[in-house]
Amino acid sequence: MVAEGDPGNLVRTIHLLVLSASWGMQCWTTFVAGFVLIRGVPRHTFGLVQSKLFPFYNHIVLCCSFISLAIYAAYHPRELLSPSESVQITLFFVCLLAAALHARWFSPVTTKTMFKMHIIEREHSLGQGVGLSANREAYQRLQEKDPKYKALRQRFMRYHGISSLCNLLCLLCNGANLVYMALLMPTL
């Protein structure tokens, strides 16, 4: 099923649109939407919004990563890859792997843990402050006096950190692949 050679204008256009749409969505979600939202709505509302949007976001990135890798692999047989093409296909594969782990494992665990934390926080009248620094002392006291909450917070931070790293890895891989594609364009 390898289709070595010129993919044609339609396939090239689809490949570029999928990759650039994914990268643009990643940039917006990573560097704009979250920061604006956390500064503008209560903490639990922020978590609820993210719990609704992120599954779609994560699976769209996963689908785009799969399509990008599939198109690239179809027109670049492994036996004929140049060193730069080997790097590019590796970036597509790493992005797909990170997107899959993010969408199917790390993000859902982060969300489930967050909702468990919300239950405890509501019992202590927390979660309605706007911004990450709202009621910081109250959250600290809650961690100190409630070992279950402290354990949940540690789990949340661990999975949120790994989830964020997967997201950044995808963003960097897609950005690098866009640079590769731009450098190969004969003209604008």
From Swiss-Prot:
It comes from the Eukaryota. It is found in: Membrane. Belongs to the TMEM205 family. Signal peptide: none annotated. The gene is tmem205. One of its GO terms (cellular component) is membrane. This is Transmembrane protein 205. The keyword Cell membrane does not apply. Keywords: Membrane, Transmembrane, Transmembrane helix. The chain crosses the membrane at residues 18-38, 53-73, 89-109, 168-188. The keyword Transmembrane applies. It is a multi-pass membrane protein. InterPro entries: TMEM205, TMEM205-like. Disulfide bonds: none annotated. It holds the Pfam family DUF4149. PANTHER family: TRANSMEMBRANE PROTEIN 205.
